Structures are given as structure tokens and as C-alpha cells.
Regions:
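Outer membrane beta-barrel strand-and-loop segments of large Gram-negative receptors
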Residues: 362, 366-372, 423-425, 520-526, ...
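Gram-negative outer-membrane beta-barrel transporters
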Residues: 435-436, 440, 448-449, 552-554, ...
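Short acidic/polar hinge/loop motifs at secondary-structure boundaries
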Residues: 105-135, 139
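Flexible loop and strand-edge segments within Gram-negative outer membrane beta-barrel domains
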Residues: 254-260, 270-331, 342-364, 413, ...
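Surface-exposed extracellular loop regions of Gram-negative outer-membrane beta-barrel proteins
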Residues: 342-346, 394, 399-406, 450-461, ...
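Transmembrane beta-barrel wall of Gram-negative outer-membrane proteins
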Residues: 184-210, 220-288, 314-316, 433-434, ...
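N-terminal periplasmic "start-of-domain" segments of outer-membrane beta-barrel proteins
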Residues: 30-58, 85
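Signature of Gram-negative outer-membrane beta-barrel scaffolds
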Residues: 383-486, 512, 582, 624-629
Length: 740
């Protein structure tokens, strides 16, 4: 951590020197963002919004989750190599809203633990990523408690010809990309093609990704010389499970490899300047992905599982978007989006030395529609909208004896009868441009969320009920002010509320997140609410920028997994194991607070130093259980984290040396009943770490780009908080992009 402090001190000194020498500062060009769904200038938004537009950062990562990690702006948890669960301001999974091209990715089965859904969006075809920090329920609805991660894929590009012909010519261009990394034997091939004239544009993209077993770093802390070592794995020989010795290659995280295929097709039709029709088709499919953390789990020195893997993760999406501009009447612009998604996921498990293999399958059909209208006034903007989403969930399961091939009944993960969930809302957001460089933001949203779940087979779990129904209505809003000075000084402060209704995963799940620990349904859950205050201040000039964000969130009715009784019993027999009973429950109160400091400084021609640092703290208390107001750690709260980078280059070439770092997460700060996964940490918690990395890109020709990177130069062995797999060791990466 001394290295981190030294870099930050030097960074601060550089800012002071530059501030003294910069006597004639000028404000840099403002950034266009889509946090309000329509294009707007970032200076008109009170909340902190980070826009990631660097194509090198976006497209030269192993997957979309790694974009967030590499940026240093978001903490990302991993249970396996084929995953990545963003944490925004202490909120994760179903409390962070994922969007792709303006369409909700969060479904009724988004769990409260850790997710990997973000990797189903291909980073090779991403155009930009926007991160909205803090409750964003006014415009985005339920789930946007910690914030919103907006993923925008590349748009088809029309070809505007200067030729005076009646029939416009067609133009074809595209990109071929290859990327290889030795740390995981990564092989990725990508192609995208754009075919267009002045009215029609067709974009197709295909990416094939293959990852072998990830090699972790070899340089371990002296206090934890064996941390993360893969000492064994389970193989099946002669119809028997046997433990294989892996001591010769302890840094190879055997079983962590996977493959993935991504396809995107877009069709744009623009008959005139005021009308656009866009058809958006996306498909993502993976191989089986081992749950690496569960495969390393032991009990009394014996592996708990012989098999534990996710089946192919499927995301199919079809969306149609209509955009109208320069409308007659009060509203000048309109967008309408109708979309359908088909999602599939599954979990397959078999305990060590057992012939019984359990299969659990989930399918979700998700239908959505939203309409947004925008009015431009001389000194104000009014954005109103309506949206509706409907989820239909089908959960099935069976057991299979691999020796006799005889099937048996087992518990489904979710309710096995007709199960559906719907979200409906109407909202308005107003922006008022006041005198003296002040901007006022205000908004309101009326939410209604309904859920109906039915349990057909209640015998296996002795269900005390046969259905679970909810109908929740909530009003959320935001109010804030922004000051944008002519000298580049920007100050914002605001308050907002967030809302999340319990979903199918919260209300109906039966599953063991670890051995001897089973989560059961709780039909009496209530919605979660957050009330957030935020203060941001920044200074931007031609030579430097520096800013800080402070936030404090009151979390009411927070859902926390805690001890529970099922049919008046605190332990039950689940999958042959006597297990403690837990369930999601609304706690009395919780708070999450923290800050971010970030900035960049031009230290020489074409040379910039940039840094970001985030600190988050969270706890909850429940007088009913403790008899006193005793604060306990809230789960999902990451340690301090950030990034420092020195970059030099121009359009022809560039190179960057950078560090990504995490602070300590002491075991006393873990939530031992939640999703912090203390069993995959050291006895003292998750140690702090700092990695040193290098990235360079060279463009010898206009249509050719070559890349060379070294991740984790020191080959450090480290692991992100709450993760069950260690990060990659020293990783050499080469890439090549050919444009045509």
C-alpha cells in the first residue's frame, strides 16, 4: 500500500504545480452521455456518470466484465473465470441494473449473490459503457439501487455519398480481430461487417472465444504460502471418483476453461432525417462453465463435489426501436422500443463418490416495451416515459443415477408451477437551466411490480404454502442542483430514492450456496428502499482534471440472508446433508457510504497521468434479533480499490504503464451469513494487493493495429474480495486488428 500512497502523493503534487502554472485555463469540451436515455451533456446531470469510450480499453479485454475491472471505476467479483459480477457503491447483482442498448438485462431470476450475465454481451462489438452511480430508479425503475451499467453496442453506419445519382451506391467496411493471451491460453477471433447506403445499413458481428485453464500468479505472500494452490482435482476412472494429485502444477486452476460464441445483427433504415427504424438481434451461448470455487471445496480433507458446473448460458434478444425527431406538438423527440429476450441457465452438481447427479434448469421469456418523449424548451427539458416488462419463468429439475441411468425427483431451484413477474411504470424527468450556470434536476416515477409464483410439488421440501404473490407500488424521485462554472469548476449535490421489489429468486429459491447451508423461500418479503445523498466537486482545465464524489445511502428493509426456521426447524435434511436453514429477510436498517477521488494531469506532450480511488463502507442492524442496535457488516461491500496509470502516445502509437490495486478486507468486516465467501479467503480475510501492468498499441497503417500487453508483470498471486478463483498470473497478450 506504500506504493499506492506514494503515487497518489506525487499525483497530487503534479496537480498543484500545474494549477499554479495554468494562468489562462479553459474548459474542455463537455461529454455527450445517455444517462437520461436521450443524448445530453454530462454537465446537465447531477449524479456521477463515468463514460468509457476508449476502444482499446473496451475491445482489448477478455470479456465485458474485465472492462470494468481494468477501468478501476467498478469492483468486479468472480466465482469462476467465465464470470464477473459488478459492484457499484456497495450494491451487487440484482441491486445493480444492467442495460444493453436501452433494454433491461435484469430478469426475474437475477440473484442477490454473484452474477455472470454481463459476459453475455460481446465486448468486441461494444461502442461504449456508461456507469451511473447511485439510485437511478426514476428513469430506470426497480433494481437500480447501486446504479446502472449501460452497455451500448456499435450502431450500423449509413454511407452518405456526394455523388449526384438517384440511386445511392453501397459501401462495405469491417474489421478482423485476433487476440491471444498465454495466461489462460486465450484465443479470440472476431469479425464485423457494415454494409450501407444512404438509407439502409446492415451490421453483423461474430466472435468466437476459447479460454483454457487459468494460470494464477506464483508470487505469494509469506504469511499465506499455500493460498489458492490447486493441490488436487477429481477424475472419474472405472466408474469411480478418485482424487488426482496436482502438486506438480498448483498454479493451474484446473477446470476453469470455457468457450463462448456471440452473434449480433443490426438493420437500420432511415427513410428521412426525422425517422429511424432499428432492428437489433443478439445471441450469446457458452459451453459448460465449471463453478471453480465449489470444485475446490473440501470437508475433512475430502472434496465435497466431483462435478459442479453451469450449463450453457444462453441469451437471445430481438429488439425493435423507432426514433422520431422534429415532431409537431409539445414533444419534439420520441423513442419506442419493443423487445423480447429468451434466457437459459442451468446448474449441474454431483457430490464426491456419489452416483446421483442433479440437473436444475431455468428458462425465462422476457417481454418489454418502453416509450420515451422529450420536450425542448428555451430554458428547460422535460422527459416523460412509460415502460412495461413481463417475465415468465419455468424451473425444472431431475436427478439421474449415472450408474443405473434411473431418474428421480429433486427440488427445483425456483417455484415449479406457473411463475411470472411484471414491472410497470410511468415517469418524468425535468431539467431546468437557471441563471448563473445553475441546472436543476427533478424527477418522479410511479412503479408497480407484481409477482405470482406457484409450487406444485410441495412434498420434497414440505412447503407450508403453495403460492407466493406480491403486488408492490412505490413512488421514487430525485432532486438535485449542478453548478458549471466558466473556469471549469463543477459542483453538484442531490438526493434520490431507489426501489427494488423482491423477485422470483428472492421469494422462491431453494438452494445451497455452500455445504451445510440451505436457503429457503420467504413469502413475506417486502420491497427494499434506498435514500441517497450525493455531493460531487470537480475542476477541469486544458491541463488537468480532479474531482471527488461523496455519497451516503440509507437502506430501508434491506434484504439480508440470515438464520430462519422452516416448519419451526432451524436445520433440515437437504440433498442428504443436515443443513442450517437461512432465508432472505428484511432487516431493520442499513447504511452504505463512501467516496471516490479521481483525476488526470498532462505532465508532458502526449503524456498523461490518471488515477482513481474508491472507498465504501456498509453495515446493518436489527434490534429484533440482537436485542440492541448492534452494527454488523453488510455483505457485498468491497475493500478500497482503484487504478493509477501513466500513458504516452498519439494516433500512431501509445503505451501505458498502470497499476490496479485493492486494499485489505479483514475477516471482521465480512458478513459471515451472506455472499462474502469467507471460505475462499485466508483466515485473516482477503489481503491487499497491487499489480503492475503494461499495454501498448501500434498502428503502422491506417487499416492495421497491433497490440502487446503484459498483465501482472510481477506474477503476483492475488484474489478479488468474495471471489473463489485467483486472478491470472503474468499474462502476455498479443492482438491484431485489420480494417477493410
Amino acid at each position: 500500500m506504500r506504493l499506492i500512497l506514494s503515487v497518489l502523493v506525487l499525483f497530487s503534487m503534479s496537480l498543484n504545480l500545474l494549477a499554479q502554472s495554468d494562468t489562462a485555463t479553459k474548459q474542455l469540451k463537455d461529454v455527450v452521455i445517455y444517462a437520461n436515455k436521450f443524448p445530453t451533456l454530462s454537465k446537465n446531470i447531477v449524479q456521477r456518470v463515468v463514460s468509457l469510450t476508449d476502444k482499446v480499453l473496451i475491445q482489448q479485454q477478455a470479456n465485458t466484465a474485465d472492462i470494468l475491472t481494468a477501468s478501476g471505476q467498478v469492483f468486479v467479483q468472480k466465482s469462476q473465470a467465465g464470470g464477473g459480477s459488478p459492484v457499484v457503491r456497495g450494491f451487487e447483482a440484482s441491486r445493480v441494473l444492467l442495460m444493453v442498448d436501452g433494454i433491461r438485462m435484469n430478469s426475474a431470476i437475477f440473484r442477490a449473490g454473484h452474477l455472470q450475465n454481463i459476459i453475455t454481451v460481446d465486448n468486441m462489438i461494444l461502442d461504449r459503457v456508461e456507469i451511473i452511480y447511485g439510485p437511478s430508479s426514476t428513469l430506470y425503475g426497480s433494481d437500480a439501487l447501486g446504479g446502472v451499467v449501460n452497455l451500448f453496442t456499435k450502431q450500423p453506419q449509413l454511407f452518405i455519398s456526394n455523388l449526384a445519382t438517384k440511386k445511392a451506391p453501397w459501401k462495405t467496411d469491417g474489421n478482423l480481430v485476433y487476440r491471444y493471451g498465454n495466461g489462460q491460453n486465450e484465443n479470440r477471433q472476431h469479425i464485423d461487417i457494415n454494409i450501407a447506403n444512404n438509407k439502409w445499413a446492415y451490421l453483423t458481428s461474430f466472435t468466437s472465444s476459447s479460454f483454457g485453464d487459468m494460470r494464477q500468479g506464483n508470487k505469494r505472500m509469506a504469511d499465506y504460502p499455500d493460498f489458492g494452490k490447486r493441490l488436487f482435482y477429481v477424475a472419474r476412472e472405472n466408474n469411480t471418483d478418485i482424487i488426482k494429485d496436482n502438486s506438480a502444477s498448483v498454479n493451474i486452476q484446473k477446470g476453469s476453461g470455457y468457450t463462448q460464441t456471440d452473434l449480433l445483427q443490426k438493420l437500420l433504415y432511415k427513410p428521412n432525417e426525422n425517422t429511424e427504424h432499428l432492428l437489433n438481434v443478439q445471441f450469446s451461448n457458452s459451453s459448460d462453465i465449471n463453478r471453480y470455487d465449489r470444485l475446490t471445496e473440501t470437508s475433512k480433507g475430502i472434496p465435497v463435489f466431483s462435478e459442479w458446473y453451469y450449463g450453457p448460458q444462453v441469451r437471445n434478444m430481438v429488439g425493435y426501436k423507432l426514433t422520431k425527431s422534429n415532431l409537431n406538438g409539445y414533444f419534439q423527440k420520441m423513442t419506442a422500443n419493443v423487445n423480447y429476450q429468451h434466457l437459459e441457465e442451468s446448474r449441474i452438481t454431483r457430490r464426491f463418490k456419489s452416483n446421483n447427479k442433479d440437473f436444475r434448469f431455468e428458462k425465462v421469456d422476457l417481454f418489454g416495451v418502453n416509450v420515451d418523449l422529450l420536450h425542448h424548451g428555451k430554458l428547460s427539458e422535460l422527459h416523460v416515459g412509460v415502460e412495461s416488462y413481463y417475465n415468465n419463468v419455468v424451473s425444472t429439475a431431475y436427478g439421474n443415477n449415472i450408474a443405473t441411468n434411473v431418474r428421480s425427483a429433486i427440488t427445483t431451484r425456483y417455484s415449479d408451477g406457473p411463475t411470472n413477474m411484471s414491472n410497470h411504470a410511468i415517469y418524468a424527468q425535468h431539467t431546468k437551466f437557471l441563471s448563473g450556470n445553475w441546472v436543476l434536476n427533478s424527477g418522479l416515477r410511479l412503479n408497480n411490480v407484481q409477482l405470482n409464483a406457484n409450487f406444485k410439488d410441495t412434498a420434497l421440501m414440505h412447503f407450508p404454502f403453495t403460492d407466493a404473490n406480491q403486488n408492490n407500488t412505490a413512488i421514487t424521485g430525485n432532486l438535485g442542483m449542478a453548478y458549471n462554472g466558466a473556469d471549469g469548476l463543477r459542483i453538484t449535490f442531490g438526493a434520490s430514492s431507489g426501489f427494488r421489489a423482491p423477485n422470483v429468486d428472492d421469494l422462491t429459491k431453494v438452494f445451497d450456496t455452500r455445504t451445510g447451508y440451505v436457503v429457503v423461500p420467504n413469502k413475506d418479503l417486502k420491497p427494499e428502499y434506498t435514500y441517497n445523498t450525493e455531493f460531487n466537486i470537480s475542476k477541469t482545465t486544458a491541463s488537468y482534471s480532479i474531482g471527488t464524489s461523496l455519497f451516503y445511502t440509507w437502506f430501508k428493509n434491506a434484504l439480508v440472508v440470515d438464520k430462519f426456521k422452516w416448519n419451526n426447524a432451524s436445520t433440515i435434511l437437504y440433498q442428504g446433508i443436515m443443513s442450517d436453514v437461512y432465508a432472505s429477510q428484511n432487516k431493520a436498517k442499513a447504511v452504505v457510504y463512501g467516496f471516490n477521488v479521481n483525476g488526470s494531469v498532462k505532465i508532458a506532450t502526449n503524456t498523461n497521468l490518471a488515477a482513481t480511488y474508491t472507498y465504501t463502507k456498509g453495515n446493518f442492524s436489527d434490534r429484533k434479533l440482537n436485542g440492541m442496535n448492534t452494527a454488523m457488516p453488510l455483505d457485498h461491500i468491497p475493500p478500497s480499490y482503484g487504478r493509477v496509470g501513466l500513458k504516452h502516445g498519439n494516433e500512431k502509437w501509445n503505451a501505458e504503464v498502470f497499476s490496479v490495486f485493492n486494499g485489505w478486507k479483514r475477516i471482521a468486516d465480512y458478513n459471515l451469513n451472506g455472499e462474502d465467501n469467507e471460505i475462499y479467503a485466508t483466515k485473516d480475510g482477503m489481503p491487499s494487493w497491487v499489480t503492475l501492468n503494461f499495454a501498448s498499441y501500434y498502428n503502422p497503417r491506417k487499416n492495421l493495429s497491433l497490440g502487446f500487453q503484459i498483465e501482472n508483470i510481477t506474477d503476483l498471486n492475488y484474489r478479488y474480495f468474495a471471489s473463489g478463483i485467483s486472478a491470472v498470473g503474468r499474462n502476455y497478450i498479443i492482438s491484431c486488428r485489420v480494417s477493410f
